């Protein structure tokens, strides 16, 4: 597994909840509590020719971000179906053989600020 993203910005009431590492599948899931919801970071490394399992969700693209000193772009989507009371947001990017996803229910500006302030 390559580098784990460091969250240099964390909103108030954003706290670590749990993590799970699956060495066989080469993936990591980290969860944070935020205002009675869960924000998750999912990482999958395909470096050992493992089967691709990107979880690309449908939604409206609201931003494409470039992080300073990084070679990849981050796509941010808003996801809401008829049963949701509040929007969810998801950010995706790939760096070489590693797929990253951050998702959860959060205010749009806070979510984008969280993603913009990721470092490796």
Residue ranges and their predicted role:
Residues 1-95:
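Short, solvent-exposed recognition patches
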Residues 96-120:
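Surface-exposed amphipathic alpha-helical segments
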């Amino acid at each position: 597994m390559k580098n784990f993203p460091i969250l240099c910005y964390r909103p108030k009431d954003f706290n670590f909840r749990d993590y799970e590492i699956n060495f066989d599948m080469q993936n990591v899931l980290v969860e944070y509590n935020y205002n009675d919801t869960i924000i998750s970071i999912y990482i999958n490394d395909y470096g050992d020719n493992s089967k691709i399992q990107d979880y690309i969700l449908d939604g409206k693209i609201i931003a494409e971000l470039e992080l300073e000193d990084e070679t990849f772009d981050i796509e941010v989507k808003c996801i809401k179906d008829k049963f949701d009371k509040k929007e969810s947001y998801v950010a995706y990017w790939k760096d070489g053989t590693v797929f990253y996803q951050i998702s959860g229910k959060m205010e749009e500006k806070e979510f984008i600020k969280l993603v913009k302030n990721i470092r490796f």
